Amino acid sequence: MQSIVTNHPPVHQTVRNYINTLHAAYPFLEEMPSGRSVLGREIFCLTMGHAKDKVLYVAGTHGSEWLTCMVLLRFLDRLCAAYRDGGAIAGVDVRTALLGRGLAFVPCLNPDGVEIALRGYDGALRNEPLVRRLSGGDTRCWQANARGVDLN
């Protein structure tokens, strides 16, 4: 199966583009508002299934763990394809598994932290002086949000 999600680092606009592509391919996938980051970047949440109470999957809690964003988006792509096609994942029929159940996916809880980890000080926007001071000169291992707060 060819994945919609490719091997591009998940900067905010790339995640937005993936979500648009996933939504176009899988119209049953819904986007719901979930808030904005310190720097105003949207925090995306996608849902599927029919239950009021949903199981929540969250990725990108720490900036330097941006790979988890890609893993969750890839999983969501495969899950949606299996749901659409009546397929299975790990031997479990996805449509049957979602009867009376719902899932919610937050592919990047900390978009500011991911931007800082991937783009350096440019990703910190107006908080660049603070990030520069807190990072000790190296943003590649940046974990926190744009205020320097660890989200877990």
Enumerate the language-model features and the residues they cover:
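Di-metal (Zn2+ and/or Mg2+/Mn2+) metal-binding site signature of metallo-dependent hydrolases
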Residues: 63-69
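Short beta-strand-to-loop junctions in surface cap/lid or active-site-entrance loops
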Residues: 44-52, 60
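Short, solvent-exposed polar/charged micro-motifs at secondary-structure junctions
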Residues: 39-45, 114-118
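Active-site-proximal beta-strand/loop segments in catalytic clefts of secreted hydrolases
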Residues: 34-36, 59, 106-111
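Active-site/substrate-binding loop(s) of hydrolase catalytic cores
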Residues: 52, 67, 74-76, 80-152
